[in-house]
Amino acid sequence: MSYTPGVGGDPAQLAQRISSNIQKITQCSAEIQRTLNQLGTPQDSPELRQQLQQKQQYTNQLTKETDKYIKEFGSLPTTPSEQRQRKIQKDRLVGEFTTSLTNFQKVQRQAAEREKEFVARVRASSRVSGSFPEDSSKERNLVSWESQTQPQVQVQDEEITEDDLRLIHERESSIRQLEADIMDINEIFKDLGMMIHEQGDVIDSIEANVENAEVHVQQANQQLSRAADYQRKSRKTLCIIILILVIGVVIIGLIIWGLNR
């Protein structure tokens, strides 16, 4: 599976794509675990190991794709009013992705250990011959070494065969790939940690600006309240002065009227 960047810049579609990938990673990890449990049993076969490797590669690609989607989701523009809700949504996706990554890395480590055990058995069996059912299917017999029922063995001085070398090289190559995939997952974990830290700094800055704005609004409201009080007092004083003037005019008018009589 290859990464196809962008879903039209739609946060809802991008979040849905991320959630879908997380579910796939979780499902694939469970399938890988079931396959690992079949290794070393009668169900083991080269075909089964090939399917296991393909499933691991597919899941590893999913993790890289999801990491890019989450980065894209975090870089989408947003308004201050949407910021907190976007952060909650992103934190949820990051948490779910981290859980699925942890499970996948766990089964990857188990797969690497199984491959190392297989190589060790191949190396050991290269100098051991036993009463195996078919000489032509040596790989199947080596894989099922643990499930054999007490074969009669004797040590020989023969050198390691070309088939043994081929098996060892294939498994060692698989081990190197698994270890590289595990390192890739570690890098994704680091990316997720950085994204959470940066997102937290952005939110803290926005919250600080909002708090400062609220303080300024409160101060402005207090100033407006004081101005309104002052205006009411000024109007009251003006009304009293006018009333006094009116009373004074009435009194003067009465005095003049009395003198004229």
From Swiss-Prot:
Q: Which residues carry this modification: Phosphoserine?
A: S45, S75, S125, S126, S129, S205
Q: Name one GO cellular component term.
A: synaptic vesicle
Show the PANTHER family listed in the entry: SYNTAXIN, SYNTAXIN-7
Q: Which SMART domains match?
A: SynN (SM00503), t_SNARE (SM00397)
Region Disordered, annotated ranges:
129-148
What are the protein's UniProt keywords?
Acetylation, Coiled coil, Endosome, Membrane, Phosphoprotein, Transmembrane, Transmembrane helix
Compartments reported by the entry: Early endosome membrane
Protein name (record): Syntaxin-7
Q: According to Swiss-Prot or TrEMBL, what is its membrane topology?
A: Single-pass type IV membrane protein
Known partners and oligomeric status: Forms a SNARE complex with VTI1B, STX8 and VAMP8 which functions in the homotypic fusion of late endosomes. Component of the SNARE complex composed of STX7, STX8, VAMP7 and VTI1B that is required for heterotypic fusion of late endosomes with lysosomes. Interacts with VPS11, VPS16 and VPS18. Interacts with VPS33A. Interacts with TPC1.
**What PROSITE patterns does this protein's entry cite?**
SYNTAXIN, T_SNARE
GO MF terms listed in the record are: SNAP receptor activity; SNARE binding
Q: What's a GO biological-process term for it?
A: vesicle fusion
Q: Which residues form a coiled coil?
A: 47-69
Question: What CDD domains is this protein classified in?
Answer: SNARE_syntaxin7 (cd15875), SynN (cd00179)
The main place the protein resides is: membrane
Q: Which parts of the chain span the membrane according to its record?
A: 239-259
Q: Which parts of the chain does the record assign to the membrane side Vesicular?
A: 260-261
Which residues in this protein are found as Phosphothreonine?
Answer: T4, T79
Q: Name one Pfam family in it.
A: SNARE
| Role noted for this protein | May be involved in protein trafficking from the plasma membrane to the early endosome (EE) as well as in homotypic fusion of endocytic organelles. Mediates the endocytic trafficking from early endosomes to late endosomes and lysosomes.
Task: Name positions with the PTM N-acetylserine.
Answer: S2
Q: Which residues lie toward the Cytoplasmic compartment?
A: 2-238
Q: Which organism is it from?
A: Pongo abelii
